[in-house]
Amino acid sequence: MKFLLIYVPNLRFSNLDKLMKVRLGDICTITGGYAFDSHKMTQKGDYQIIKMGNLYNGIFDLSRNSSFINAPTKKELEYLIQENDILITLTGTTNKKDYGYTVQMEQPKNLLLNQRCALIRASKVNEKYLFYLLNSNDFLKQFYASSTGGTGNQTNVSINDMLDFKVYISNENDQSKISNILNALDKKILTQIKIINDCMSYRNAIVDYFFESLSSDWKQVRLSNILNEYSELHIKDNSIVHATLSKNGIFPKTDRYDRDFLVKDEDKKYKVTHLDDICYNPANLKFGVITRNTFGDCIISPIYITFTIKNNCLPKFVELLVTRKHFIAKARKYEQGTVYERMSVNSSDLLSMYVLIPTLFIQQKIVNIIDIIDNKISNEQKLLNLYKTQKDYF
């Protein structure tokens, strides 16, 4: 008689189907920050005041708008931040999600929490598990839904409302396992981000080397010899993708950034852009918003300028040329306007600029080298996205 051996894997988490629904205030304490007197604040001192800016995007940065006080009172010392405390920002912009950022403290030294932030301290739950719980979609949905208007377009979340949020938690043993796994994934994510940033720095250095050290025999031409401005208009009728422009490229608009509900004219015309066009925002060139269209046919805001690339240049080479910091700095000399936010570079001035261009053969060699680096960056980005997907699973 033969026996069939069936190997059943050990379940990492044994009771995930028995999650407990609890009130957030029953597993932690939440206290608001203190309204420190701005007149007592200095640029240097013994105790630093932690403001919302220090927690922006969930990244703890003490260098952002640093403020200090000396000799805090007994009352002020009640807001001293301790190891494993979780800080969260409570105030943001209406219809945006620029708040609700959380940071868990590691070895804080002489840090005091300012108003518009809250300090969350675990009482009946694993401290690291609580941190990840506060970053979950379930928590954030309740967080943003509970926000109420403040001054102007400001919105706030009440601590009393937060205390009544309902969350699901696992048993103590699984809390430790889950938090350890998520912590390990966070470390992988941070390492992966550093790898990508290092690759980008290497790429930029290589591009600068080509344009600054190898261009002595390149031909000087006006940008108008390379680019041709055009304006093709189209209404938004869902026959073509509506996209947005950034320094990182052209991407389809998401609901989060779609402000078309503010547009009253249903026949409003949008700019059409095609594959390999060069597009830029005249008012945001100072922020690097100039890019090549690698997405394909789409409509974009009519404030953007679109160019086709003439046959004497390779599209990717032109992209490398116009996205360099050195090029943007030269272009900004043509900025017009008195208000910084509205200062812009006209397309006619941009096209009048002189640039150095090599032969098509040299352009192709440069593009081939950068393509190798870009493929490396793309693969590293895919791995980063995989780690993030694994984390989202929890």
For the regions a language model picked out, list residue spans one by one.
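Non-catalytic DNA-recognition/assembly elements of restriction-modification systems
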Residues: 1-6, 12-34, 164, 169-172, ...
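Short amphipathic coiled-coil heptad-repeat segments
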Residues: 1-18, 184-187, 191-222, 382-394
